[in-house]
Amino acid sequence: MRRFSETYGQKKQITFFCSNLSITAVVIEGLLKHKEEYGALERGMDILAEAVSVTLGPKGRNVVLESGKYGPPQIVNDGVTIAKEIELEDHIENTGVALIRQAASKTNDVAGDGTTTATVLAHAMVKQGMKNVRCRSKSIAIKRGIEKATQFVISQIAEYSRPVEDTKSITQVAAISAGNDMEVGQMIADAIEKVGREGVISLEEGKSTVTELELTEGNGWFLKKGFISPYFVTDTDRMETTQENPYILLTDKKISLVQELVPIHLELISKTSRPLLIIAEDVEKEALATLVVNKLRGIVNVVAVRAPGFGDRRKTMLEDIAILTGGQVISEDAGFSLETVQLDMLGQARRITVVKEGTTIIAEGHEREVKARCEQIRRQIEASESSYEREKLQERLAKLAGGVAVIKVGAATETEKDKKLRLEDAINATKAAVEEGIVPGGATLIHFIEDLNDWAEDNLLDDELIGALIVEKALSAPMKRIIENTGISSSIIIEKIKDKDFSIGYNAAQGEIEDMYEIGVIDPAKVTRSAMQNAASIASMILTTECIVVDKKKTCSLETSIYWLVLTNKYFCLDLLRLYFFLKD
């Protein structure tokens, strides 16, 4: 008889308790292959895709999320929020859920919208790909075909996208992402027009049932640096940290030693009971560990962020933030050190929000200092002869002078908090549209099917061609689901739209085939591109997966426990058997 370690891999010990008897049994880690593996993976992916895809399009349904034992249920229409809440008991099925969930999460990280589209695309590619893998197609070649086809589609999206040139387009993009709410679309367009493209747009929970827009000039800053450690997060569902009325420590040096933090962190801030935001070149080793421990213990509500930029640009940007917040940059060049910091040298803000991708600072007051700084930057722009330097100065000026728009979200009940999620999607979609332009809405990808098919047949062979055709079939999945969510069959409508101009799509709200640009149904090109890229990436990864190793959550009977213990420790065999029969009687 061969040992389990030879047959099944590494053994694992688990302790079982029976009355006052503790027994250790040996169980193996489960390893599934081929049909079993793919079947369980598919079931998990099917469950997630169905739960998320019902929300797609203007006729999409809502999903109710349980909020635990005490909170009210939450009604949402946001794909990534739904995906994060799904956990299955079966480990293999849950792995399938987690894999498809990545497509939504990555799209949300990059574009802030399009998570449901990414999920539908990824699911369609995986389902079609698995059929071919089961028919002995080479998964690596299929992966290459998927990647090449995806690059072709992305190049087509870039070619057909239109730049956003007016407020009307911004309003339309925001309205579509907010669930066809034109009032919200207009509000976001007004906010961008007032604060500029580099300005800050922030969301707050309102105190009434009405959603309001509050504008201030020169009081906000967004830096593209997020928290150094996820242990600083205060809201694990949204993976963000929000601080009200925090102090802000600004320094251009690395913080490596605990001794550098003691004066400001433990002696000054802890006595005020106010939060602390640290913006430094970096926070390393024991200093970071100290901050995290004190955060978790509730001694100081702190979050650390790396300073933006490099070299002299970093110093000037830190000085800009210092002027905005009324603080000073702790720099050795200015004769300051962390050991000698006083409370009046720290900046202050009304609120800060830190996520993985960036930090939003909303300050109050200091308008005169900010205006003076803006004038100084304008003079530097006039004097500069370098186009690169002028561009960077313009960015700084836009950030300082752009201002802040605060949208106070009103909701009648806790259950209607979905409104805030839709507003977030709308803001992110609008910013994405400004960056990379717009394309027609209503699942534009369907128009690339014919071009992709011609390109693939001319450039690819064998299993690579199969990979490209998998992408081709998946391109119709978003439109198919949008139409099905209206309650009608999709096949006839899809065939009608395929051969028409790029701007023609299906207006699911009215049930008509129309020009999407003319009726204002448009999507950001960045959102469509990100959804396509991430769906293809996840699908390729799943199709090249050969096996999964998971823990089998399987209880072991007392007889089995003793049996394996007898095999591994014969000296205690007799005593344990006597005890077993005694307990059994």
UniProtKB/Swiss-Prot annotation:
SUPFAM superfamilies: Ferredoxin thioredoxin reductase (FTR), catalytic beta chain (SSF57662), GroEL apical domain-like (SSF52029), GroEL equatorial domain-like (SSF48592), GroEL-intermediate domain like (SSF54849). Gene3D superfamilies: GroEL (3.50.7.10), GroEL-like equatorial domain (1.10.560.10), TCP-1-like chaperonin intermediate domain (3.30.260.10). GO terms for molecular function: ATP binding; ATP-dependent protein folding chaperone; isomerase activity; oxidoreductase activity, acting on iron-sulfur proteins as donors; unfolded protein binding. Its EC number is 5.6.1.7. GO terms for cellular component: chloroplast. It is found in: Plastid, Chloroplast. It catalyses: ATP + H2O + a folded polypeptide = ADP + phosphate + an unfolded polypeptide. Pfam families: Cpn60_TCP1. Keywords: ATP-binding, Chaperone, Chloroplast, Isomerase, Nucleotide-binding, Plastid. The keyword Isomerase applies. It is an enzyme of class 5 (isomerase). The keyword Plastid applies. ATP binds at residues 55-58, 113-117, 442, 507-509, 523. InterPro entries: Chaperonin_Cpn60_CS (IPR018370), Cpn60/GroEL (IPR001844), Cpn60/GroEL/TCP-1 (IPR002423), FTR_bsu_sf (IPR036644), GroEL-like_apical_dom_sf (IPR027409), GROEL-like_equatorial_sf (IPR027413), TCP-1-like_intermed_sf (IPR027410). GO terms for biological process: protein refolding. Forms a cylinder of 14 subunits composed of two heptameric rings stacked back-to-back. Interacts with the co-chaperonin GroES. NCBIfam families: GroEL, PRK00013.1, PRK12849.1, PRK12850.1, PRK12851.1. PANTHER family: 60 KDA HEAT SHOCK PROTEIN, MITOCHONDRIAL. Belongs to the chaperonin (HSP60) family. Together with its co-chaperonin GroES, plays an essential role in assisting protein folding. The GroEL-GroES system forms a nano-cage that allows encapsulation of the non-native substrate proteins and provides a physical environment optimized to promote and accelerate protein folding. This is Chaperonin GroEL, chloroplastic. It comes from Pyrenomonas salina. The gene is groEL.
